[in-house]
Design a protein with these regions (language model features):
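Walker A (P-loop) phosphate-binding motif
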Residues: 1-23
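Phosphate-binding loop that captures ATP/GTP phosphates
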Residues: 15-73
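Cytosolic-facing regulatory segments adjacent to core modules
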Residues: 52-118, 138
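Conserved Switch II/interswitch segment of TRAFAC-class P-loop GTPases
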Residues: 124-142
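G-domain G4 guanine-recognition motif of GTPases
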Residues: 132, 157-169, 187-193
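Conserved C-terminal guanine-recognition region of P-loop GTPase G domains, centered on the G4
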Residues: 142-154
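Beta-strand-loop-alpha "switch" segments that mediate conformational coupling across diverse proteins
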Residues: 163, 177-205, 218
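NTP-binding/hydrolysis catalytic cores, primarily Walker-type P-loop NTPases
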Residues: 200-239
Length: 239
């Protein structure tokens, strides 16, 4: 894929490293991978919080505290069908509830834009959109940008170019800007080994490989989006 879960997980880890109390929410409600990327057991999920109508403050101990004491994880529902019970009104409630206990919220969204995502986009302060120089990824990113433009959400979008230095891409960074008609605010280098190892360990590379260029790139991104944010982007399935 384009790497949005990797970016979301490490962006949240970077906020926490900076000293901000951060909640990473897996909003890929049916097939989210945040729990795997952070090596947490989804004992308390988005579904549990919303369907049990929990007041967050006295139940903060249910959240999973990660490696950094400032980073908390709210995984996607355990069963894909549980996502069907979550509606747009609940999205607003979720953000309002979480905002009372955290400095920063980072939502990892699914590849497909649905009504719940659109509600989340409208309520967010920033939308971090991840893409690569893969032509199929750029085509799908353009489609998503067009949707958000019609909803007058373009001003919230921050475009990130992942794996920008991968030798397999023939498109250069300037071409991306021309194709999508939007500035790229940050680039992230291509390092399969670091990313793969960090996922297998369940520890964001911000912590497991803190001195790698890819970790520095995420920290630079964090300095540009120091607000609640949604991380989205179209994944491209390789055949």
């Amino acid at each position: 894929g384009v790497g949005k879960t990797t970016v979301a997980t490490n962006l949240a880890a970077s906020f926490a490293e900076f000293g901000l109390k951060t909640c990473l929410v897996d909003f890929s409600l049916q097939f989210g991978d945040v729990a795997m990327f952070t090596n947490v057991k989804p004992n308390f999920t988005v579904y549990d919080m919303l369907l049990n109508n929990l007041d967050l403050t006295p139940n903060l101990n249910l959240f999973i505290e990660h490696v950094n004491p400032n980073l908390f994880v709210l995984p996607a529902p355990v069963l894909p069908e549980q996502a069907d019970y979550i509606n747009r009104a609940m999205v607003s409630k979720l953000i309002k509830n979480l905002s009372t206990s955290f400095d920063v919220l980072v939502f990892d969204t699914p590849s497909v834009v649905n009504d719940l995502c659109l509600e989340l986009y409208k309520l967010s302060k920033q939308i971090v959109m991840v893409t690569t120089k893969d032509l199929a990824a750029l085509k799908n990113t353009k489609l998503q940008l067009d949707i958000l433009d019609k909803l007058e959400l373009t001003d919230k979008i921050k475009l990130i170019l992942n794996k920008h230095d991968s030798p397999k891409f023939i498109v250069n960074n300037e071409d991306v800007k021309k194709m999508l008609n939007i500035d790229v605010i940050a680039t992230i280098p291509h390092t399969n080994t670091v990313v793969g190892n960090s996922i297998n360990m369940g520890v964001p590379f911000i912590y497991s490989y803190p001195r790698e260029p890819i970790a520095d790139a995420i920290r630079e991104l964090m300095s540009k989006v120091r607000y609640n944010c949604i991380v989205g982007g179209y994944n491209v399935e390789k055949k």
